[in-house]
Amino acid sequence: MLRTSLIGALAMGLTLGLAGPLQAEAPDNEGPQFEDPRHAVTWRREELKGIERLVRQLRFDLVNNRDARGAEPRLEELTQLASGAHLLPAFIEGSHGRGSEARARIWEEWEEFEAGFLALEERVAALREAAEAEDYRLATRELSDLSLTCRSCHRRYRY
C-alpha cells in the first residue's frame, strides 16, 4: 500500500515536473497560459489523466475502503484540478489537430462546453459533501454521476 502511494506520488511529481515548463500562470492567476497550442494539448491531456486517476483512487477510498478521512487530500486536489478555471485556458481555439482528441465542435459550442465544466464542478462539490458526511452510499452514487458527467462531455467533444 505504501509502495503504491509512493509510486503514485513520484509519477504525479514527474508529470507535474514535465508539464510545468510548458505553461505559465496567467497574470491574473486565472489559470495557465500557453505559448503554443501543442503545449496546451499536452498539458490538458496530462491534467485530464491525473483527474481520471484521482477519481479511480477516490472510488477505492470511498467505496472499497469507506475512508473519508483518507480521501480528503484527493478530494481537495480534485476540486482544484476539475474546474473550468484550471482547465479551460488549455482549450485554445484551433488546438484540435494532431495529437489532440478534441473535436472542433468545442469552439463552435463554447458556452455549452463551459457549462459542462460547471456541471463537473457541481458533481465534485456533491461528492465532497457526501464524503464529509461519511455517507458512503451517496458518495458511491456521486462518483457514478461524476463519471457520467465526464462521459457525456467526452462523447460530444472528444474523438
Cite the ranges covered by each PLM segment.
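Bacterial N-terminal signal peptides
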Residues: 5-17
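N-terminal secretory signal peptides that target proteins for export/translocation
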Residues: 1-3
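Sec/Tat signal peptide C-region and signal peptidase I cleavage site
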Residues: 20-24
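Sequence context surrounding c-type heme c attachment/ligation sites in exported
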Residues: 25-34, 38-70, 76-159
